[in-house]
């Protein structure tokens, strides 16, 4: 019989409170759960709790299967609407992939769907995107997103890329974080396998940022892969893993071509890429899960939604500037399994140096700064990556108890839904949300920027209780 873990119970309680919240600005909420924390069960528990029709969206076939199976395990009844499964059936509980339902929002609305649940909500949940358009067709009362990585890497032509929290960028549909289970709590409660890090030397001189500045160019990634003799080093590390008793190894590489080159060097290995036919992919993964195949090399797939608790070895040769990709790849091996005492993670792309160990990561609503991702006391979000790092001590503001004074010549809002309104008529919850959108451009065509900054300073004082 399924017994929920304490963090799953707390997440469910926070979701329940969110569903009862009638604040119109609190429609889109994010639940943060580490890799291996059992998001599928939290989704299933939420669906069970609801008394109205619900739509569950996940980006891949693998995640859909995983989430659907967990709900059925708990005794639920549901249907699947997905071309990947060759079944398209709507019901009061529907599990789906976005591409299959993007044009049937009206049909889903007619079912009476009031709640939408989105797994891996950091992925393609931007305003104006497929999922956003679908939500607008359905018009639910609440949208609940779940993810291990509530961040988005956002480019800027003038300042370079910034890593932003999902609720602090105007490009994301989500505006609040309603629950966080920290990685350190999962570890302290014994729900992660002990990670053995192997941080191999990496020369990054060949890497070049792409035009948006949010990642490295594909060509420079391949060149760096080759300059570091990565194929040979993967084989060497794989052999070391096997000699240590590692039973199952998943390898991430930067291209389809490199996957097949490596396949020729590791006896008995198999390859899965985003070009592999679904039927062949299923057969390969079944052999891997059954222990027939010891090593699977992959590109463009298996980063999320691949549930293999016995996996005890990952070699990551995929160079990335994305924390989400790094964490998802590393997270494939943290799940608990019988007779699995430790998990070996080998990094050949400089990713550990770039992001640190995942155990040190926390997502925190810090004092009057708001939500941020931290590694210890170091802030990792909310400012251009080219700038010097910021720490918690830099974020602590001295609050003046004197009533704030609007020293700006600007007295009314000049944009958005409250355009033309005097400040006194604008809800503080909206002002607070607006100030937390790190990507929002504060500009007024009729006033100099110094006046805009004075206005913004006054807004900050208002939400801090000085107005």
Spans of features found by a protein language model:
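A conserved SF2-helicase RecA2
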Residues: 179-193, 337-401
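Post-DEXD/H (motif II) to motif III coupling segment of the RecA-like Helicase ATP-binding lobe
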Residues: 123-195
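Conserved pre-motif I regulatory segment
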Residues: 1-32
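Conserved Walker A/P-loop ATP-binding site and its immediately adjacent core
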Residues: 41-73, 256
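Conserved interdomain linker/interface between the two RecA-like ATPase lobes of SF2 helicase motors
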Residues: 175-250
């Amino acid at each position: 019989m399924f017994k929920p873990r304490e963090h799953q119970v707390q997440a469910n309680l926070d979701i329940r409170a969110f569903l009862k919240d009638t604040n119109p600005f609190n429609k889109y909420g994010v639940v943060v759960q580490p890799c291996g924390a059992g998001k599928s069960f939290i989704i299933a528990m939420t669906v069970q709790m609801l008394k109205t029709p619900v739509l569950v969206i996940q980006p891949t076939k693998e995640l859909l299967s995983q989430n659907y199976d967990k709900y059925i395990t708990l005794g639920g009844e549901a249907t699947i609407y997905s071309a990947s499964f060759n079944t398209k059936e709507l019901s009061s509980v529907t599990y789906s992939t976005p591409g299959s339902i993007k044009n049937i929002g009206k049909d889903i609305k007619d079912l009476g769907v009031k709640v939408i649940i989105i797994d891996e909500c950091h992925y393609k949940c931007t305003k104006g995107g497929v999922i956003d358009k679908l939500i607008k067709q359905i018009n639910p009362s609440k949208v609940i997103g779940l993810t291990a990585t509530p961040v988005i890497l956002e480019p800027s032509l003038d300042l370079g890329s910034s890593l932003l929290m999902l609720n602090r960028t105007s490009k994301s549909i989500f505006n609040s974080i309603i629950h966080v289970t920290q990685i350190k709590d999962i570890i302290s409660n014994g729900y992660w396998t002990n990670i053995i890090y192997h941080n191999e030397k990496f020369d990054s001189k060949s890497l070049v940022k792409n035009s948006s500045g949010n990642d490295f160019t594909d060509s420079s990634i391949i060149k760096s892969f080759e300059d570091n003799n990565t194929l040979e080093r993967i084989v060497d590390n794989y052999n070391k893993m096997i000699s240590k008793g590692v039973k199952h190894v998943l390898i991430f590489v930067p291209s389809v071509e490199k996957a097949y080159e490596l396949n020729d060097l590791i006896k008995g290995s198999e390859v899965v890429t985003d070009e592999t036919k679904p039927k062949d992919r299923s057969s390969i993964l079944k052999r891997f899960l059954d222990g027939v195949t010891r090593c699977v090399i992959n590109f463009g797939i298996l980063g999320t939604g691949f549930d293999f608790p016995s996996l005890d070895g990952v070699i990551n040769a995929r160079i990335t500037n994305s924390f989400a990709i790094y964490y998802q790849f590393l997270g494939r091996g943290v799940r608990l399994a019988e007779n699995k005492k430790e998990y070996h993670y080998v990094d050949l792309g400089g990713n550990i140096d770039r992001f640190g160990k995942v155990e040190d990561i926390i997502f925190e609503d810090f004092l009057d700064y708001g939500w941020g991702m931290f590694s210890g006391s170091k802030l990792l979000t909310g400012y251009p990556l080219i700038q010097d790092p910021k720490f918690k001590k830099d974020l602590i503001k001295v609050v003046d108890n004197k009533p704030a004074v609007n020293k700006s010549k600007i007295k009314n809002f000049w944009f958005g839904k409250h355009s033309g309104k005097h400040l006194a008529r604008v809800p503080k919850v909206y002002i607070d949300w607006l100030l937390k959108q790190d990507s929002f451009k504060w500009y007024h065509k009729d006033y100099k920027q110094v006046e805009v900054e004075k206005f913004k300073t006054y807004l900050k004082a208002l939400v801090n209780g000085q107005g």
